[in-house]
Regions:
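Charged, amphipathic alpha-helical segments
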Residues: 2-7, 87-120
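Solvent-exposed edge beta-strands and adjacent loop segments
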Residues: 2-94, 147-163
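Short, surface-exposed beta-strand/loop "edge" segments at domain boundaries and coil↔beta transitions
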Residues: 29-32, 89-92, 130, 136-144, ...
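N-terminal start-of-chain detector that recognizes signal peptides
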Residues: 50-57, 101-107, 113-117, 136-143
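Acidic surface patches and DE-rich sequence motifs
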Residues: 63, 135, 173
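Beta-strand secondary-structure signal
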Residues: 79-83, 130-132, 165-169
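Phosphate/anion-contacting hairpin/loop surfaces
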Residues: 116-138
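Mixed-charge, glycine-accented linear interaction segment located at domain edges/termini
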Residues: 138-184
């Protein structure tokens, strides 16, 4: 027996997420070969990320004698979620619809300190773009070239600072790709 793909050739791993970058546009394969400016380096909580692209829904078709005749499969539902631990204005603006600035005479003074910012709607906001995930050892990258995200603000959970619970749904880009997997 001749083995053409040995274990050493197959040892390209994605061994945990080190960085999550958000770009505010859909990516194509040709975009990856150019210098890109990431819109945002998201501060994702450790152990706060789930990357499951969905188990396929397989239906087995049987004939009258009980034998499997054929199968049909559909794409499964993805479970891609992460927690972004920041209430910086740029992050708030990304995940919530901005309403009115709270500055100047409208700002609040508590114990001599002045606070200002913005008001937001908590209604779900669709955020479209792409996600680039760098592995811990930077040997591989997973790119979701076209995602739609929704987030909810969690102001306190007892263990973590305030964060956004983000759910991302990968969609095919113009080229038909839902995911791009890259290695060094």
């Amino acid at each position: 027996m001749t083995i053409t793909h040995t274990l050493s050739k197959l040892r390209t791993l994605f061994n945990d997420v080190k960085k999550v970058y958000y770009l505010n546009k859909e990516l194509k394969a040709a975009d990856l070969g150019t210098e890109m400016t990431a819109f945002m380096d998201l501060p994702v909580l450790e152990d706060g990320i789930t990357l499951n692209t969905g188990e396929p829904d397989v239906t087995r078709i049987k004939i009258i004698n009980g034998d499997n005749w054929c199968t049909r499969a559909k794409k499964g539902d993805p479970d891609i979620s992460f927690q972004v631990a920041s209430i910086a204005g740029e992050v708030n603006d990304l995940f919530m619809e901005k309403k009115v600035a709270v500055t100047g005479a409208a700002s609040i003074i508590i114990e001599g300190a002045t606070y200002s910012g913005n008001s937001y709607s908590l209604a779900p906001k669709s955020v479209k773009g792409s996600l680039i995930l760098m592995s811990e050892d930077q040997s591989s990258v997973i790119v979701f070239p076209n995602v739609e995200m929704y987030a909810s603000l969690v102001a306190a959970d007892g263990d973590n600072p305030a964060y956004f619970n983000v759910t991302a749904t990968p969609m095919a880009n113009e080229e038909g790709a839902d995911v791009m997997i890259l290695g060094k």
